[in-house]
Amino acid sequence: MRVLVVEDNALLRHHLKVQIQDAGHQVDDAEDAKEADYYLNEHLPDIAIVDLGLPDEDGLSLIRRWRSNDVSLPILVLTARESWQDKVEVLSAGADDYVTKPFHIEEVMARMQALMRRNSGLASQVISLPPFQVDLSRRELSINDEVIKLTAFEYTIMETLIRNNGKVVSKDSLMLQLYPDAELRESHTIDVLMGRLRKKIQAQYPQEVITTVRGQGYLFELR
C-alpha cells in the first residue's frame, strides 16, 4: 500500500513516515499542498493523511479541491481543532476520518488501517437494483450507468444499505461496518456521511431512496 502524508511539521512528518514504513507500506511525504498534488498525480497513493494547517493552502481547501476533481482515495485528517463543529466541517469537506492533536501514532495507524479495510477490493460481484448498481470489486455505485463518486465511507454505507434493500439498518450496525475497532467510533459521523451521500444520489436520482426511520436507523428502498 502506498500512503501520502501531507504534514508541514518536519519532525511529525518524519515520525509518521517511519512508523508507516515499519508497517510495511510505501510512503510519500509532502510538506505542502503543491508537493501533495505532485505525489497524488505521479505516484497514485492508496490513502492520504492530511494535516489542516498547511503553509500554502489550507487542508480543508485541498480536500475540497481533490474531491471536486473526483479524487476518491480515502483521506484521514490530522487536526488540532477539537469542537464537534470543526469535525463536522472536516467530514463535510470530503474527509473520511480524522484524528485530533495531540495524538498517539498508534491511533493514526489504527484509523488508517480501518479506512483501508473498508476500501479493500472484494471478489467480482455486482448488486443490481435498477437504476442502481453496486460493483463490489471496483467499489463503485452507478445510477443509470453513471458512476457516482463516493468516498470510502460513503461507499461502505451505500453497499450496506443496498445489501439490506427494504430493511432498516441500525446506526450501530453502520458504525460497526465503518469502525470495527469500538474505540474509534463516534456516532455523529454517520449523520454527516449520510447527508453527503444523499446529496450525491439526489443529484443523479431526485427521488428519495434513503429514509431515516426514527429511533431505528436507515432504510434504502426504491418506490
UniProtKB/Swiss-Prot annotation:
The gene is phoP. One of its GO terms (biological process) is regulation of DNA-templated transcription. SMART domains: REC (SM00448), Trans_reg_C (SM00862). This is Virulence transcriptional regulatory protein PhoP. The modification 4-aspartylphosphate is found at residue 51. Residues 2-116 form the Response regulatory domain. One of its GO terms (cellular component) is cytosol. Keywords: Activator, Cytoplasm, DNA-binding, Phosphoprotein, Repressor, Transcription, Transcription regulation, Two-component regulatory system, Virulence. Residues 124-222 bind DNA. Pfam families: Response_reg, Trans_reg_C. Phosphorylated by PhoQ. It comes from the Bacteria. It comes from Shigella flexneri. Member of the two-component regulatory system PhoQ/PhoP involved in virulence and adaptation to low Mg(2+) environments. Necessary for resistance to killing by polymorphonuclear leukocytes (PMNs) and cationic antimicrobial peptides (CAMP) they produce. The keyword Electron transport does not apply. GO terms for molecular function: phosphorelay response regulator activity; transcription cis-regulatory region binding.
